[in-house]
Amino acid sequence: MKRLYLRKISALLMMCVLLITALAGCGKKAENVSDNAATEAPTATEEALTPTEAPAATEAAGPYYSADASVESVVTDAAGKGMVGNWGLGNEYEIQALLTKYNQPTTYLSQAFDMDGFDDDSILLASAMTYNELGLVKNSYDGGYGYGDGVKYIDMNDEGVAMLEDNIFTTGKFAKENPETVKAFIYASMKGWAYACANPDEAAQIVYKYGSSVSADHQAYMAGEVKKLVETDMTGAAVTNYGNMDDTAMQQTLDLAKKYIKLDDSAAADKLQTLTLDDIRDTSFFTAAAASDGKFTPEKKDVSIQLKWLPQAQFMGYYVALDKGYYSEAGLNVKIVPGGGDIGETTAVYTGQVDFGVTWVSNLIAAKAGGMDLVEVTQVYQRSGLVLVYKINK
Amino acid sequence: MKKLRSKFNRQTITTILYPVLFGVLIAVLWQTQLLHKIIGADTFTLPLPKRIFGIITDNWSNILINVRATVIVALGGLVLGSLFGYLLAIVATVFPKWGSGGLTIASAFNAIPIIAIAPILNNLTKDFSKDPNIRSMFAKMLVVMITCTVSMSINSYRGFTELKPFSLDLMESYAAKKTAIFFKLRVPNSIPYVFTALRISVPACVISALVSEYFAEYVIGVGRQIRENIVLAQYATAWAYIAIACGIGIVMYVILLIVEGVLLKGRR
């Protein structure tokens, strides 16, 4: 019995020793690794990052940027240091367009789905959605970083590199076979969005009720910001026709997509360059839904919609339409399928796992170029919600 | 003798021929789209081999950059992890009372999923270097190292301790010192076990390198390309990188088998 006890203690001791040696091992390896990596670096970054001198104005008062620094000086400095962050995976095109606008290489750091990289200064110019990450950075509620006025941001809409984001899409085949279902779904969804924008606080509560990935406070903040994206276009003008597909904004999105979506598959890359607005969107369903009296005879009653991300106020219109019974009034039985992580909403819709999906127009264009028969039927967000946030010197 | 050799040859021929024939059969079924009918896929999610091969040849220089990054991480992690594992086994042999128990606990490290440790190590190595490429490569190597350490330490510990019957008694009857026993008996005895460990570690190091790239700060590597292309619905390109990833694993395994065959000739 005593021996067993002894053995247990010695095992514990051994574990401590192992841990310590493991940690010591980590330190020792440092030299090897940097050797390897140093030789790798020049080839890995094709577009060599040539460090540029930070503008004097930004360096004078502290480690960050002065409150009145120009967009160009901030972008040039951060890109020169190689510290511009984005999530990648199809979210990077607006950032690359902005970097190109200021003659910078289009490489960026891979940003995690939190703002820790921005917080610990490994990313100077971090991507953020106005309705999500920007709120977390500024506010000090649960999960927030509490920077308040200590940060400023660069708006893609102001810079002329905005691309359209959240829309509603389906497959060309589904739209052709179930036109009434598509119209009914658009009608009820946009009715939900209209209500949500008129009552953002209530909409936030409804979303929270249906299973939220974030706190109630953040949900309320998000609803307020999402409302702005639905009600304002890229030029800042008010939009009353919710869900309208504006040709100018759509064309700008397509043009930027053609320039910045890089596809290794030559067949897909060629197809991307030939795409026109008519290939990616069909306005007929939206026009018909807007003109209708709200009575539909859907061909398929049980439909589902795949969200691009976790349940949050970004998708409040759908949750409101479900909660207020707008979908059932239109003769539909709707199931909302949350996304998250690496769920490809385009693939889910294309393979028929779900009938509708919410995605960014650029992702739809990439999928279309890859050979998926997808078509946008409504454009919910009228302007880009993507910003680049940076800290300012106090 | 002659009969034996011909028998041996026939055996090696069949062991190579059958898998190759099976592979060719699958490739033919795949290209003729019969495979798609059997498993109910379409040519979009499962593109034809010809198209995949075309993408590989079109983007060869770009692919090489990613392959290089992945191989450096995999090999670096494999070497570091194996050396560290061997060292742990030596420590465990020198202190036999703690040794076996300690190694059992160490093997618990093997149960940590790569997906869980990769982002954590990413955050822990933020201060390592100012260059994101270097620090993210370091983080990736640590992930690979953790997966390679355990199999090496457990296997080589067995090699150090499970000696041939009476060989230890013989050495002791010669009044051999402990160091002599260690270098003349234990170390040579551990070599086949080292290769057993490597047979596990080599495929594992490629897999963990690919997965760690998913979460790395710096966008590079075969694994990262697979993820990007699948999310962007570029399945043909994703399949091209999957094929490359398989190639890396197979080539490294074959190299290991050849080295093992040369070094352990006549020992097995």
Predicted regions and their residues:
Chain A
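Conserved C-terminal helix/tail region of periplasmic/extracytoplasmic solute-binding proteins
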Residues: 250-300
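Bacterial N-terminal signal peptides
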Residues: 13-22
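Bacterial N-terminal signal peptides that target proteins for export
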Residues: 2-13
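Bacterial lipoprotein signal-peptidase II cleavage site
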Residues: 23-35
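Secondary-structure end/capping motifs
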Residues: 177-263
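Pocket-lining segment of extracytoplasmic ligand-binding domains
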Residues: 111-213, 355, 362-363, 392
